[in-house]
Amino acid sequence: MLKNINPTQTQAWKALTAHFESAQDMDLKELFAQDAARFDKYSARFGSDILVDYSKNLINEETLKHLFALANETELKSAIEAMFSGEAINKTEDRAVLHTALRNRSNTPVMVGGEDVMPAVNAVLEKIKSFTERVIGGEWKGYTGKAITDIVNIGIGGSDLGPYMVTEALAPYKNHLNLHFVSNVDGTHIVETLKKVDPETTLFLIASKTFTTQETMTNAHSARDWFLATAGDQAHVAKHFAALSTNAPAVSEFGIDTDNMFEFWDWVGGRYSLWSAIGLSIALAVGYDNFIELLDGAHEMDNHFVSTDLESNIPVILALIGIWYNNFHGAESEAILPYDQYMHRFAAYFQQGNMESNGKYVDREGNAVTYQTGPIIWGEPGTNGQHAFYQLIHQGTKLIPCDFIAPAISHNPASDHHQKLMSNFFAQTEALAFGKSAETVKAEFAKAGKSEEEMASLVPFKVFEGNRPTNSILVKQITPRTLGNLIAMYEHKIFVQGVIWNIFSFDQWGVELGKQLANQILPELADESEINSHDSSTNGLINAFKAFKA
């Protein structure tokens, strides 16, 4: 079980507080000038394909010493062991947390309730293999005998964000099948998607563990109605719909053959479910072998996380540096900035992964915390972000630690595009770290022939303070394996921070209240009668909505 340890009561936290007071004038220019080996000391390699450079952070040896002490005092190692051994560390739902078992390529037994889950995991993988080979190979036929050309994944949250992110990131590996993702209950999403597909050659994947999720089932019923408007016979549904679920009666009632139901388990959290049957759309998009490569990559990072000392453990290092900014520097957000267009949904994926996991104000004993927990996560691909929000990162008043991610080898080496992209990648972290002094600005102005008066009026606006922290994550190439490495790295970073903050990272009760209230409001929207059962604002909005519709 996870221990209940208030991090602020540890000796390490107190030492970090004192260290922060004395280290507020820490300057990256000076840190690099004082230590020619700083990059070597504060960077780590994962295998031969990933380099993590954390040298451009506001840290020194003393900072890291206290951060590792914090990890030890909060018993991080025992927490890691508890998760991987199948203990029910998701206490509020009384569940184990074993997305790692889904990618346990060593097949060593993983016990839940006295039972090894690996045979069941492998059975689902075999079922995915058989199914995807039939669909990709054209053996699976629609109701008119035509092969499938389009896959529509209908899900929401983890049943959508993960598969969508991965299929986009691995687009260079895609086969002939066209992938579409529908998540929003806004009818526009399903209607616009259905305009692009043919009922004779489309396969729908309905991704809902309970087969009751409102948004997913609303879209699923609309898709079935659209399909039957052409196909006519309810029996044809079985050839065009598959389910990623555990509710066999509901799946069967919908018209899906339960042979085409792919199960997963309650120890798989939604935001960690792409490794499970929820990843069926990934396997269909890039092929089963590439899906297994993705699992292999994640398993490699799992092994590193479990077996590596904290001081050399990449997810642990990244997590601790994040805590340094979040809890001591007062940083409220972190930016994830992939310099790879295929990775354009990576930040959005970990926005859910991080904010749904660690957006908690109650500790593991049920008490309100007195310290900051999960940060706001956001980001966009480079170089788009440079022309949008980097201004604030460079010259704004908020400290925003950034992760820059880039591949050394592009899948599209067109002309000199990649060199230009990478020159920006390297330049941005250098600019953020070291800035540009007033003296340098003046010298540039003087060289350009500016007058003293012009210089005096413009210099303050051209100065870059620097000292903006970044991590640089350089990947040889984005492949299924390295993508698996990266996803698992961030997953474990989130876990480490949750352990240290003494919160439960694997529930998400914060999503429930809005859903409950929506279910109460829904019948109130069925007619034109005036509503007065809520507060004045909600009543006014509902009644205005009805008036607009009238």
Swiss-Prot record:
Pathway: Carbohydrate biosynthesis; gluconeogenesis; Carbohydrate degradation; glycolysis; D-glyceraldehyde 3-phosphate and glycerone phosphate from D-glucose: step 2/4. It is an enzyme of class 5 (isomerase). Transmembrane segments: none annotated. GO terms for biological process: gluconeogenesis; glucose 6-phosphate metabolic process; glycolytic process. GO terms for molecular function: carbohydrate derivative binding; glucose-6-phosphate isomerase activity; monosaccharide binding. Its main location: cytoplasm. InterPro entries: G6P_Isomerase (IPR001672), G6P_Isomerase_C (IPR023096), Phosphoglucose_isomerase_CS (IPR018189), SIS_dom_sf (IPR046348), SIS_PGI_1 (IPR035476), SIS_PGI_2 (IPR035482). The active site is at 356 (proton donor), 387, 515. CDD domains: SIS_PGI_1, SIS_PGI_2. It is found in: Cytoplasm. Catalyzes the reversible isomerization of glucose-6-phosphate to fructose-6-phosphate. Belongs to the GPI family. This is Glucose-6-phosphate isomerase. The lineage of its organism: Bacteria, Pseudomonadati, Pseudomonadota, Gammaproteobacteria, Vibrionales.
